[in-house]
């Protein structure tokens, strides 16, 4: 999902040529001092700042032992960086893990099984959000081991620009009444009052009620799950009745044909060009806070075709299989500290939103609650609705994961381009793309 196809294909194809050799054979990790471990993260400023906060707290806690953390930047795409560092024997002791590629790299033996450490230290996994624990069980089939520890709880939510609603004279709904039908009603009301919104904000010349990206995996997975359609299942791109498949496609398409949204347009909720925006927690909140948007957050709409599923995901850290024996204990202490209540609180000082520990979600004075000015209930409400975004986890061969993800992305981008991108009906559109995806699945 995050990776450019050209880069990802290079990395994955290269891995295919060595998969039979056993990926854990080479390695040995990056050379450091006896009490220093390396932690590899994506090479961007926000991740570096996040890790620095956690590193400083960890080093302070273990000052007597002299434990240190050296930050290693993963340059280029994640897949390319992991492959390149592994082949060079330069994998860090601990590495950042992303939900959408975790199954692939787990299958290649890059991440160490953490169950032994969890059992030894009597870590109670019931203290954490169930879906976050499930998503870190990134093995395939009956393998239910934890190969990494989730850092923060992320799911689809709905952001509301309150200034837009006020200008339009539309009341912001409550979380309890925020159903799919209510969302459509609100979008129509915002559309009907477009002139009021434009008149109230002289800095914009275009307005749409909402943004909703159907080509983003959490969105299309959520929509089809609510229509009782499984993706990439039983040899089918869409495993469900044609009636439900077409109904879901038509519902997503209607958001554009009714004028509720502009797909791919350069419009932004932070400027007031949008009234609503469907997005994740991790990247959304820091953006709205940075731009000082007068916003509110609602859950993802419920009661879509009678169901209320919503995709969730996570970023975390895992110990690499290349971590040397003399560093494993320090690496585990770092991971378990990040996962502890103390570590979650310290990490929240980076401005990260929504920890994975249940007790901190509703704790009024929890550190993470200091970094947004809104009612944060939507970030963790209704955990029973959660579905893992990693819908390809058990699909084999894992080498096909990236190309399959990409084909779903291209499909849903084309749904909003020139009305099925030259295909005359939803049925013809579906027939073309389902065959294309299923060809990738063979």
Regions found by a protein language model. Give the residues of each.
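Extracytoplasmic "Venus flytrap"/periplasmic binding protein-like
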Residues: 57, 61-131, 166-169, 270, ...
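Hinge/lid segment of periplasmic solute-binding proteins
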Residues: 99-156, 199, 296-301, 373, ...
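Short, solvent-exposed loop/beta-turn-alpha elements that line the ligand-binding surface or hinge
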Residues: 115-130, 175-177, 201, 226-247, ...
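Extracytoplasmic/periplasmic solute-binding protein
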Residues: 139-151, 156, 166, 181-236, ...
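C-terminal capping/gating helix-and-loop segments adjacent to ligand/active sites or protein-protein/ligand interfaces
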Residues: 141, 150, 375-436
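Glycine-centered hinge/linker elements that transmit conformational signals in sensory
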Residues: 187, 233-263, 300
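Mature extracytoplasmic/periplasmic domains
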Residues: 267, 317-402
């Amino acid at each position: 999902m995050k990776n450019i196809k050209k880069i990802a294909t290079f990395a994955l194809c290269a891995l295919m040529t060595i998969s039979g050799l056993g990926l854990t054979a080479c390695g040995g990790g990056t050379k450091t001092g006896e009490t220093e471990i390396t932690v590899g993260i994506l090479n961007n400023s926000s991740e570096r700042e996040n890790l620095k906060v956690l590193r400083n707290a960890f080093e302070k806690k273990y000052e007597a032992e002299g434990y240190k953390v050296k930050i290693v930047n993963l340059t280029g795409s994640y897949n390319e960086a992991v492959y390149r560092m592994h082949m060079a024997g330069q994998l860090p002791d601990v590495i950042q893990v992303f939900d959408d590629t975790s199954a692939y790299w787990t299958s290649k033996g890059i991440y160490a099984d953490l169950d032994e450490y969890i059992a030894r230290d009597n870590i109670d996994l019931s203290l954490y959000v169930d879906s976050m624990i499930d998503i870190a069980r990134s093995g395939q089939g009956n393998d239910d081991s934890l190969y990494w520890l989730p850092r923060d709880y992320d799911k689809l939510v709905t952001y509301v620009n309150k200034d837009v609603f006020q200008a339009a004279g539309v009341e912001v709904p409550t979380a309890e009444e925020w159903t799919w039908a209510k969302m459509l009603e609100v979008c129509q009301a915002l559309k009907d009052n477009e002139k009021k919104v434009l008149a109230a904000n002289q800095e914009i010349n275009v307005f749409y009620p909402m943004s909703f990206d159907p080509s983003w995996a959490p969105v299309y997975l959520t929509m089809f799950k609510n229509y009782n359609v499984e993706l990439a299942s039983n040899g089918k791109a869409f495993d469900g009745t044609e009636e439900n498949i077409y109904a879901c496609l038509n519902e997503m398409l209607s958001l554009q044909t009714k004028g509720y949204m502009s797909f791919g347009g350069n419009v932004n909720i932070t400027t007031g060009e949008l009234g609503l925006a469907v997005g994740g927690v991790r990247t959304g909140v820091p953006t709205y806070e940075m731009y000082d948007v007068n916003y509110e957050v609602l859950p993802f709409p419920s009661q879509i075709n009678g169901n209320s599923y919503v995709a969730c995901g996570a970023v975390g850290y895992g110990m690499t299989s290349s971590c040397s024996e003399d560093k494993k204990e320090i690496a585990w202490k770092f991971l378990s500290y990040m996962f502890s209540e103390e570590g979650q609180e310290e990490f929240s000082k980076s401005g990260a939103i929504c920890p994975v520990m249940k007790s901190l979600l509703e704790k009024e004075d929890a550190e993470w609650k200091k970094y947004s000015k809104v009612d944060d209930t939507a970030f963790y409400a209704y955990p029973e609705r959660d579905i893992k975004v990693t819908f390809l986890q058990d699909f084999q061969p894992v080498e096909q994961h990236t190309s399959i993800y990409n084909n779903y992305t291209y499909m849903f981008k084309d749904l909003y381009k020139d009305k099925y991108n030259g295909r005359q009906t939803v049925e013809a559109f579906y027939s073309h793309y389902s065959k294309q995806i299923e060809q990738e699945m063979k």
